[in-house]
Structures are given as C-alpha cells and as structure tokens.
C-alpha cells in the first residue's frame, strides 16, 4: 500500500510542477509578487535587509525547492519498490533531469515566459542535492 501512496505522491507532485510551468507569466508573476511582498515584510520585521530583486530570488529558490522535493519523492518511491540503489540512482537522476527539461519545454509555450538552460541546471541541482542528501542519510543509517 505504501508503494502506491509514494507513487501517487510522486506523480501528483510532478504534475503540479508541470501545471505551474503552464501558467502564464501574469498569473505566475502575481503569485511570486504576493509571496515576495509577504517575505519582505517578515524580513523587515526581523530587521533583515535584502539587496536586489527579492521576487527573482524567491522564484529561483522555489524552483530549486520543488525539484528537491521531487528528488526526495523519487528516492523514496524507488526505495519503496525495492529497486537496487545502483539502478535507482540512475533512474532518480534521469527522471529528475527529464522533468527539468520537460518543465522548461512546457514553459516555453506559456504566455510571457521563456525557457533557459540555466533554469534546467537550477532545477536539476535541486534533484541532485536531495538525491545526495538521501543517499548520505541511507549510508549513515547502516
């Protein structure tokens, strides 16, 4: 039963990534602006000043985080299905990179948005970071 639950979570989260990529820039920008304004107020209250474009930084951090979450879901799903680590490593990294490429491809068709190789690398670095953290965690348990 847990196998199916992890697989459903993985598929649902991946679809959510693709859904967010299909949003026009106006909708995506509005969400980012609201989040940046809220975070900016929190930082002001805490006495922390941020130089530069907080919205841009927040968008990039959200991409990294989303792909890190997906990387964790990929690792856990393959673990639940008892796929050998060596094979699972390849599958996790390949599927993480594939998701990043497809995500940017979808985004290229969304109004007001573009795709960039740098974004694929940023997205994949989230997957790679979580995969590495997961493997270190697994190794430390033995």
Segments the model singles out, each with a brief description of its role:
Residues 100-124:
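Interfacial helix-loop-helix junctions of multi-pass membrane proteins
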Residues 1-2, 79-87:
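Membrane-interface helix-boundary motifs at transmembrane edges
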Residues 1-72:
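"…centered on the first transmembrane helix and the immediately adjacent amphipathic helix/loop
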Residues 2, 59-62, 91-96, 119-123:
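Alpha-helical transmembrane segments of multi-pass integral membrane proteins
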